[in-house]
Amino acid sequence: MSDQPPAENADVRQRRAPESPVTERLRAPARDDARPTSDESDMEGILQDEDSDAGSKNKEEKLERLTQAIPQDKGSLGVFADSMLEALPPRWRNWVVRGLFSIIMISTFTFIVTRGATWLMFLVFLIQFKCFQEIISIGLAVYRLYDFPWFRALSWYFLLTSNYFFFGESLIDYWGIVLKKDNFLHFLVAYHRLVSFALYCIGFVSFVLSLRKGYYMRQFSLFAWTHLTLLLIVSQSFFIIQNIFQGLIWFLAPVAMIICCDIMSYMFGFFWGKTPLIKLSPKKTWEGFIGGAFSTVVFGILLSLALYNRPFFVCPVQHYQTDSSNCTIPLAFQLQDYPVPRPFSFVYKILRKEPIIQLCPFVFHSIALSLFASILGPFGGFFASGFKRAFKIKDFGDVIPGHGGLMDRFDCQLLMGTFVMVYIHSFIRVPDASKLLKQIMTLEPQDQLNIFNLLQSELSKTGLI
């Protein structure tokens, strides 16, 4: 086989298919005046951070600046108290600080519970605002938008709008009962969804008008950050307040179970913890997890036995506010007869007693709530730990010495509030006759008569009248 002449080979190498305009632009040398935008610089910085050692240093510097922008808990109690704890090892110093502020928080919470539903709702809103502020502050630091004052204001505007959408109708009904006024702010209830949507549209248009060239990526990222935070924070606080309306015990018991699980898991892990539980939280141990779960179930049973016969805790809020002296105890809190399990029935036979035990159903409900609080509740904390690790921060804030921010204390409550609401709707809640009557009375007179005639006809068929 004969080789081709060199000249022909050179000609073949020089012949190429015509390039598209896009390819030509990509191959064209960069111009001196072609400067990347702010968003492009961010993307280039991210790629450099992932692919080079120099980028790794830049990443550490950025994370250090982020940590400086977000207050971190140092476990300090002030100069005088710190000097008293100075001789203790850091581990025990942290134990004392955490224990002291745990006692303060539990005492404050107990006082607020005794003041009733209104105080508890204000507490939920206060915690909601602070948790929202902590998460939004992290977003503003990450996307470096502190020099956009209107963006921070927009985030808070969306929070207020979301609260009005979620809480408008229920809180107006509640305050109508408290103030003993019929049709309280009825015009807001009638057009609640329209007003909510109009308020959201104002915020949406304001966001679009605030967009600046070179900051689009950051602004849209924080817009999504804000809405995800609203979904997590506002919706959960809405569920928690709905639980309060069902009776204070549906708020108090789950919250107390989470607190018990946190404390006992910490205690068991502090003294006996050796086996790591999850990489996201290296300090969490299997010993603490199991000890906390067992303690929470026992605590839940004891708490249910202590509160089941107290109308202040078990009556739905609207019924208790209307007539606290004649509140009908819900079925879940009325004593019922249950047969003693066979392995233990022989004890009753020896004592010549009928093998029946009286318990209220809420004792069994408390076991289900305790198991969720101790087994799945901690995953809210693991989720928060993963979030903090993603941004290389230790705490969401420093408002509570020894604990961090409020979000650090209430991360486990997020899942719990939703579970209790789902549990109530699945196993406990029954239609509220007074609420149905109130809705009927808002109808036109002819519609009210139609409902009366239809109801009378159905009751006659069933033989009730």
Curated annotation (Swiss-Prot):
EC number, as in UniProt:
2.7.7.41
From the record, give the transmembrane residue ranges: 95-117, 121-143, 158-178, 187-207, 214-234, 239-259, 288-308, 367-387
Please list where the region (Disordered) is annotated: 1-60
User: Spans of biased composition, class Acidic residues?
Assistant: 39-53
Q: Which domain of life is it from?
A: Eukaryota
Q: Does the keyword Protein transport apply?
A: no
Tell me yes or no: is Ribonucleoprotein among this UniProt entry's keywords: no
Q: Which family does it belong to?
A: Belongs to the CDS family.
Q: What is this protein called?
A: Phosphatidate cytidylyltransferase
